[in-house]
Amino acid sequence: MCIRDRSLCTSLNHVVCHGIPSDRILIEGDAINIDVTAIVNKYYGDTSRMFTVGDVSVKAKNLIDATYESMMKAIKILKPGIKLGDVGFEIQSYIEDKGFSVVRDFCGHGISNIFHEPPNVLHYGKKNTGVELKPGMTFTIEPMINAGKLDVKVLNDGWTAVTKDKSLSAQFEHTVGITENSYEIFTESVKEYRKPPYN
């Protein structure tokens, strides 16, 4: 999701999501999420990933790695018959074991020829709860993970969300579909460019 006359969102360091591109110069140690949307034959694809500028702290690297792994762990369990609570549980349990926190204020979403539609895809939850997955469903999985507490606030621009404690935040996002027996990732990159860091 983008804003105003911008074509993407850029969420830097403690910005959780919906960061507005600016003329701020990136410096060594920055971590930035770039979130883009494509429209192909009237259908939407939504994806984001983390990039780092030069050397980053060990904590930032660990946060970025854990965020990516939590998304992929959730994706790998997708198939008809499981429930969205299973997806959230997979992310939450992995992240909290790493000592990080899962943002509750934002979630993934159904997506097709409408950008945001049901169901909401929470990145926390209990097993065997929520909507049951069926073939043909398409949605995003996009965990937002904080190095500190889960609390966020929206800035005065009414758009940019940041961590309340100013801790680092990271996010990855894929658009996925449920097939007859498994899943498909629609926003996957070429073979050599799947896993971070993309610096």
Residue ranges and their predicted role:
Residues 1-199:
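Active-site neighborhoods and metal-handling regions in enzymes and metal-associated proteins
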